[in-house]
Amino acid sequence: MNATPEKADDLIVVGKIFSVHGVRGEVKVYSFTDPIENLLDYPRWTLRHEGKVKQVELVSGRGSQKGLVVKLKGLDDRDEARLLSGYEICIPRSLLPNLAADEYYWYQLVGLKVINQDEQLFGKVDHMLETGANDVMVVKPCAGSLDDRERLLPYTEQCVLAIDLEAGVMRVEWDADF
C-alpha cells in the first residue's frame, strides 16, 4: 500500500470498506456503482478516512450477500484489514465512463440550485438517495431559498425539466407546497 494521494478534488467516492472477511486480510466492501461489480473494474483505489489517504491495488474481488469481498495487494492479515474499516474507496473522475448528453453522475447534480416552474428557488441538491423505484434528490435550503424546508424530489423525467451544469441550475416541475 502506498501513501501517495491523488489530487483530492479529482476523486469520486465509489464505495466504502465496512468490515473484514476471513483471516487472510480480505475486506467487505459496499459499492456505490451500478451494477455493484463495476467497482472491480478499477484496479487502483485511493482510500480516505479521517484525513488519512492510502493508495491500494485490487488483487481480486467477488460478490457476496451484502456487497463485495475484495483482496488488496499487500493486505494479508485480518487485524491489518480491520484498520481499513470505514475507509471510502475513491477513483479519479477521469476514469468514469462518458455518459450520453442527457445522463449525469450523482456527483454532478450535488450542489445544483433547484428552481421550479414558477422561478422559486427551493435550495441546492445536497445528496441523492436510491429508493428502488427512482432516485430521489435531497434539496436543502440555501441563501435566497423560498423557505427553510428540506425537500425530497424524485429524479424523474416528469419532475426534472432541464439541467445546466455550467450555470449550476436544475429546473423542476414541482409545487412549492409539496
From Swiss-Prot:
One of its GO terms (biological process) is rRNA processing. It holds the Pfam family RimM. One of its GO terms (cellular component) is cytoplasm. It comes from the Bacteria. Keywords: Chaperone, Cytoplasm, Ribosome biogenesis, rRNA processing. Residues 101-178 form the PRC barrel domain. Gene3D superfamilies: PRC-barrel domain, RimM. InterPro entries: PRC_barrel-like_sf (IPR011033), PRC_RimM (IPR056792), RimM (IPR011961), RimM_N (IPR002676), RimM_N_sf (IPR036976), Transl_B-barrel_sf (IPR009000). The keyword Calcium does not apply. GO terms for molecular function: ribosome binding. The keyword Repeat does not apply. It is found in: Cytoplasm. PANTHER family: RIBOSOME MATURATION FACTOR RIMM. Belongs to the RimM family. Binds ribosomal protein uS19. The PRC barrel domain binds ribosomal protein uS19. NCBIfam families: 16S_RimM (TIGR02273). An accessory protein needed during the final step in the assembly of 30S ribosomal subunit, possibly for assembly of the head region. Essential for efficient processing of 16S rRNA. May be needed both before and after RbfA during the maturation of 16S rRNA. It has affinity for free ribosomal 30S subunits but not for 70S ribosomes. This is Ribosome maturation factor RimM.
